[in-house]
């Protein structure tokens, strides 16, 4: 069994991927929903996910091609924190908005001018949160050319990020997960076709 097949089966059995009718944070509705916030409650599978992510980062980007990991609270920060430990890389995170107190920074952590930052998030839908993080990081002097997500819902994030000069990488795509689950007999064909109808 390949990584995506095993990971997909775990997402399904743990309830981290659900099929039905869900409202997304952007206001739209979807026949499927990924909630990776529950994955750290399963330490063995969480470790496997982080190791799979590290292997993908090494093969697709290269540890020598970035200086720091940068994440987006809250879902992505848990993933990036574990990945930073495994990769032995510094970690910063970009807020959606500056705090109204303290330093008022939008980026927390040390960002050296000219540092190459690899953005890490849990799930990408349209790419909006990654774009906002990249804007904050670039304003702080970082260079952002790549972003890595655990799950790409495949609903336009890749194209939007590409227009911003950011290549999107993923551990798995929504369609890969659905096809794997269908092949394993865990979801019916009509559910898989609903996913196929939304992804691009």
Curated annotation (Swiss-Prot):
A molecular function (GO) term: orotate phosphoribosyltransferase activity
SUPFAM superfamilies tied to this protein: PRTase-like
Cofactor(s), by name: Mg(2+)
Presence of keyword Cytoplasm: no
EC number, as in UniProt: 2.4.2.10
UniProt binding sites for orotate: 125, 153
Signal peptide annotation: none
Record GO biological process: 'de novo' UMP biosynthetic process; pyrimidine nucleobase biosynthetic process
Pathway assigned to this chain's UniProt record: Pyrimidine metabolism; UMP biosynthesis via de novo pathway; UMP from orotate: step 1/2
Catalytic activity from the UniProt record: orotidine 5'-phosphate + diphosphate = orotate + 5-phospho-alpha-D-ribose 1-diphosphate
Family membership: Belongs to the purine/pyrimidine phosphoribosyltransferase family. PyrE subfamily.
PANTHER family from the UniProt entry: OROTATE PHOSPHORIBOSYLTRANSFERASE, URIDINE 5'-MONOPHOSPHATE SYNTHASE
Complex and partners: Homodimer.
Identification of the protein by name: Orotate phosphoribosyltransferase
């Amino acid at each position: 069994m390949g990584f995506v097949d095993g990971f997909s089966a775990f997402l399904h059995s743990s309830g981290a991927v659900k099929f039905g009718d869900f409202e997304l944070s952007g206001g739209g509705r979807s026949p499927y929903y990924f909630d990776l916030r529950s994955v750290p409650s399963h330490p063995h599978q969480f470790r496997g996910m982080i190791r799979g992510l590290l292997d993908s980062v090494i093969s697709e980007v290269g540890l020598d091609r970035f200086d720091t990991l940068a994440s987006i609270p809250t879902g992505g920060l848990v993933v990036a924190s574990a990945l930073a430990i495994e990769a032995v890389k510094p970690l910063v995170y970009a807020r959606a908005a500056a705090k109204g107190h303290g330093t008022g920074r939008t980026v927390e952590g040390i960002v050296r001018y000219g540092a190459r930052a690899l953005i890490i998030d849990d799930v990408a839908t349209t790419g909006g949160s990654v774009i906002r993080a990249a804007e904050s990081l670039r304003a702080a002097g970082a260079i952002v050319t790549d972003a890595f997500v655990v799950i790409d819902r495949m609903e336009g994030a890749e194209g939007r990020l590409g227009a911003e000069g950011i290549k999107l990488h993923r551990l798995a795509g929504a369609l890969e997960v659905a096809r794997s689950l269908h092949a394993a007999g865990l979801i019916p064909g009509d559910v898989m076709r609903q996913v196929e109808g939304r992804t691009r």
